[in-house]
Structures are given as C-alpha cells and as structure tokens.
Amino acid sequence: MTIWVDADACPNVIKEILYRAAERMQLPLILVANQALRVPPSRFIRTLRVAAGFDVADNEIVRQCEAGDLVITADIPLAAEVLEKGAAALNPRGERYSDATIRERLTMCDFMDTLRASSVQTGGPNTLSPRDRQHFAAELDKWWLESQRKK
C-alpha cells in the first residue's frame, strides 16, 4: 500500500497531515509534482518530479498506483482512473470518491464549464477550513483502518 499525492495542487496543510500519517502508519507516501518539493526527512516520504505539462503528474500516478493504494487529489478525472485500477481516492477536503460521486462531480464540472464559456464568473473553491482538515484526517484514518482489516 502506498499513498500517492497529486502534489502540485495539494494544500500545504494537507501535506503536513500526510507527513505525520506516513510516519505513524509506516506507509510509503509519494508526492508527485512538476516542481521541486521540500519534504521532511523520512524513510517513508519521497517525491517524484515529472516534466511540466498538462496531466503529466496525473498520468504518472495512474501508471504507478495499484489496487489498495490511496490517491489524494482534487482532480476528478484522475480520481476516476485510479478507482478503475482498484485504488481509493480522497480529496483534500476529506471526500472519498466513489463511482457515484465521480459522475456527480463530472456533471457539475461540465455545468461550470458551460457557465464560464458564457462569461459567467464562477469563482474558485473556498479555502480549507479547520473542519475540512479534521474531516480529511478522519477519512485518512478510516481508509487506513479499512485497509488493515483487509490484510
């Protein structure tokens, strides 16, 4: 089992939670990004730098992740691909992706794209709240416990 992080877009506060979790769970944590990242020294934490470009990091995560792994991403198409491989996917707000939530999110993305194409300003997501961080940490622990039961 490995935790993969779509690190270019992952908030720093979530990365900090993941660093502590990797140590506690003694699980490999791999942060994939197209830029250099600073991570704490650990035998469990490493970075994987990929070339800059559209979906390069996403494609590398899909290529390397396996069934039973966890992928941290806010990217819906990436989440859909890793679910197909048998991995779990969790967004930085602590929402666990499923086939149903992926379909719902893709529909919403299409709708928002239509609004933006019509020159409607839609804004971006809200900043992460302390509640979001707590929810993420709780869902991460829940995934860990579920994966331990399957062993």
Swiss-Prot record:
A Pfam family the protein falls into: DUF188
Superkingdom of the organism of origin: Bacteria
InterPro entries: UPF0178
Transmembrane parts of this sequence: none
CDD domains: PIN_YqxD-like
Family, similarity comment: Belongs to the UPF0178 family.
Protein name: UPF0178 protein YaiI
UniProt organism field: Salmonella choleraesuis (strain SC-B67)
